[in-house]
Structure formats: structure tokens, C-alpha cells
Amino acid sequence: REITDWEKPIYVKIGASRPYYDVKLAVKAGADVIVLDGMQGGTAATQEVFIEHVGIPILSAIPQAVQALQEMGMHRKVQLIVSGGIRNGADVAKAMAMGADAVAIGTAALIALGDNHPRLDAELKKIGSAAGFYDDWQNGRDPAGITTQDPELSKRLDPVEGGRRLANYLRVMVLEAQTMARACGKSHLHNLDPEDLVALTVESAAMARVPLAGTSWIPGSTC
């Protein structure tokens, strides 16, 4: 804060593993914004065992993070941004209803820009992958020319066309989320709350802390 003369907000990004405790630590440290990243993000920039077995899904992490903020009287004061597995407007609406202030995307934006396109299949096979399966964006060899510093690969990205595709994707995502809010009788996306949600399985009801569909039962919380 001193370096920026208190002009820049402090973002703290944490992986979703024990969000109840980690969010409280971030708030006590003075974070303005907490970015909570779930295990379902698309990166391959870590060990396989971490990708498959470390962290929890973002929709099970949000209730814990919100509870921590509420107990500290900081919900909506310290912003909560969630990411990791956010792909469409339904994901956005669910996250907002559970108490997030905003969402962030990564892999979804890359796909919208043109990564993993079928036309790249031959190039992807040369590096041991295939269209729809490439996720080694950290190695700088992205055949789509997006996540690379290689000047030759970078030429493959048409920023105008890519920007148009990304804008279309974001526009549709927003419209989907807004439509879901209206279906719940809400005039604004930020008016969604947990009462607008139910779960279709016992497991998802327990993780998200919302009632099982057709009941008022929240597993582990109410009778």
C-alpha cells in the first residue's frame, strides 16, 4: 500500500482448500479483494496429483468464504471474486446467489479467443495433444499463439477476430445470468441470494449448503 500511496486495492488470491480460515487470514492481513480459485480450473501448470486431489470445487468453497466474511462483518466490504470452473451464465448466477461479488474466468476466455480449435489439431498433435485437450498454456508453445512469447506463434492470433469472439462469449454469459435472475423474480443479478437455489443431489446440497430440491432439508445443517 505504501508503494502505491494507498491508490491501488490489494488483491489476495487463494486456492480453495480451507477457505473459511484462509479468508479470515486474508481479511486480517488487510486485503481489499479476495480471489478464491476452485479446483475445477483448466490449468495444467502443476503436478497431476495436485490437479486431481488438491482443493475443492468453487461452489462448495463459496459458502465457507461467505461465512467467514459475515462473521467478521466484512461481507460486501471486502469483495469476494470466485474462479475455477466458471464457464457459463448459470455458473455466474449460482456463484452470485451464494454470496460472491464477481467471478473471474481464465480457460473459458482462451477457448473463446480460439484456443483448442479443431483447425489446430495437426499442430497440437505434434506436441502430444489434440484439439479440445490442450491445457499446457504455461509452456509457451501454444499453437493458437495466445499464451506464448514466440513471435512466430504470436502471428497466428488475430486480435480483432479473437476480441470479437471473446466479446460475444462474455455478452452471452451476462445475458444468461441476467435471464436466470429474472426467472427467480429478481430485477438485478446482485439481488440473487441462497433462497433462489436448490440442489439436485444430497452431496451437492451438503457442499453448497442449500436445500435438497423438493424439501427444506440442508444436509448437515437442518433436520
Q: What name fits each language-model region?
A:
Residues R1-D150:
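Glycine-rich phosphate/ribose-binding loops and adjacent secondary-structure elements
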Residues L153-C223:
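C-terminal extensions of enzymes
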